């Protein structure tokens, strides 16, 4: 829904101005309170306003099935340390880059959204936000390839900028270009960063997790920071540390008490059974008094990831993937994989469906306090790396 722009003398004919309703503003303000300082809270507020307005517009005016492409937890972990929000439309990623600045002489994008292969989007949208007046203005866009080839890099704040003369002002051009040339490349090649060792990552987390470090993204060299930020599990832990939250991803604590609130929002839950009830499912399933489940959507269908402690062997755990619908089967080609916390494979860490099967499973012996990462191919919707701490 667009708003009356007659009072905006600076708005061009092709600019898109969207209303922020009082309800959207109130909700964004409430959601922006879970951050470490006033600066990060304000950044989260601006990002939430732009996200809410743009999603409403895409769904109302274009009937797009648009989504954030990230869970609320992942959004919070990003907004705590940098600016920008990804919106996904039919597999195309748009990064909203909100700013209060009236000056739109350049589109300025944090380096994290340009030089990290897992996070770089197809397009960047410049978004001017005016919270007091209740509107946001989408004033132009560019592709990742355009930003890399024509933009300039500023090491002082680790950002790429593109002059407004190179920014495409009419957002409708984006939709037309996608229709006429859907296969046209939008991204430049990106070299992956060196792997970050686990002990180095832990040292960085302890240092940057201190909320007195007001701008952690500039506190260490970018290769170190980028590797930490790109890893969703480490980024989530950094956010938790900066807010003084501990053991939110402890599997033992989930089983003994309850699943943490943030994990519950992501689809984790706990099921309790009588041991004999679980055993009745067959010898193939390990028995336990309680198991953990994660609800997933893959290719439009519901699945369930289960984490089951072995009844007799301490430290042995079973990961199972199965469909949520009884009698349904996992298609051939699906993969269930476990990795170390620093994303390294290990022996017998993967199960592959060579044909349609009832379930995929992996049994693994885990040391106390060891972290594991689960992966599934094809990727579940809104997937981000999670570190489960045993």
PLM region descriptions:
Residues 283-390:
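C-terminal, beta-strand-rich globular interaction domains
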Residues 2-5, 14, 40, 56, ...:
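Residue-identity detector for threonine
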Residues 90-293, 297:
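Long, hydrophobic alpha/beta structural blocks
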Residues 1-71, 232, 236-274:
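N-terminal domain-onset segments
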Residues 24-140:
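An N-terminal, globular interaction/scaffold subdomain
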Residues 7-10, 35, 64, 222, ...:
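Phenylalanine-focused residue identity feature
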């Amino acid at each position: 829904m667009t708003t009356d722009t007659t009072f905006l003398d600076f708005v061009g004919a092709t600019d898109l101005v969207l209303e922020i309703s009082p309800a959207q503003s109130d909700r964004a303000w409430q959601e922006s309170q879970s951050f470490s300082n006033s600066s990060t809270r304000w950044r989260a507020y601006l990002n939430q306003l732009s996200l809410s307005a743009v999603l409403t517009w895409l769904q109302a005016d274009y009937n797009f099935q648009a989504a954030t492409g990230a869970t609320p937890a992942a959004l919070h972990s990003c907004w705590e340390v940098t600016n920008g929000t990804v919106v996904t439309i039919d597999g195309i990623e748009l990064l909203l880059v909100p700013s209060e600045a009236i000056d739109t002489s350049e589109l300025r994008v944090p380096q994290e959204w340009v030089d990290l292969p897992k996070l770089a989007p197809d397009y960047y949208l410049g978004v001017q936000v005016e919270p007091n007046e209740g509107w946001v203005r989408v004033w132009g866009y560019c592709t990742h390839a355009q930003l890399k080839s024509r933009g300039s890099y500023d090491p002082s704040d680790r950002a790429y900028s593109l002059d407004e003369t190179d920014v495409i002002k009419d957002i409708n051009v984006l939709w037309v270009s996608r229709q006429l040339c859907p296969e046209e490349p939008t991204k430049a090649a990106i070299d992956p960063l060196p792997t970050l060792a686990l002990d180095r990552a832990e040292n960085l987390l302890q240092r940057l997790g201190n909320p007195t470090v007001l701008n952690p993204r500039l506190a260490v060299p970018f290769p170190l920071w980028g590797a930490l930020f790109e890893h969703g599990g480490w980024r989530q832990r950094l956010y938790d540390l900066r807010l003084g939250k501990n053991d939110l991803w402890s599997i033992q604590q989930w089983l003994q008490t309850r699943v943490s609130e943030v994990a519950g929002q992501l689809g984790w839950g706990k099921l309790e059974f009588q041991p004999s009830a679980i055993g009745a499912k067959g010898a193939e399933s390990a028995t336990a008094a309680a198991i953990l489940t994660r609800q997933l959507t893959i290719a439009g269908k519901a699945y369930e990831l289960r984490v089951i402690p072995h009844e007799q062997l301490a430290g042995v755990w079973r990961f199972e993937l199965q469909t949520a619908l009884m009698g349904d089967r996992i298609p051939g080609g699906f993969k269930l994989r476990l990795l170390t916390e620093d994303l390294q494979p290990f022996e017998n860490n993967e199960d592959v469906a060579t044909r349609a099967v009832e379930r995929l499973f992996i049994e693994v012996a885990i040391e106390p306090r060891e972290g594991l990462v689960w992966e599934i191919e094809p990727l579940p919707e809104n997937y981000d790396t999670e570190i489960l701490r045993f």
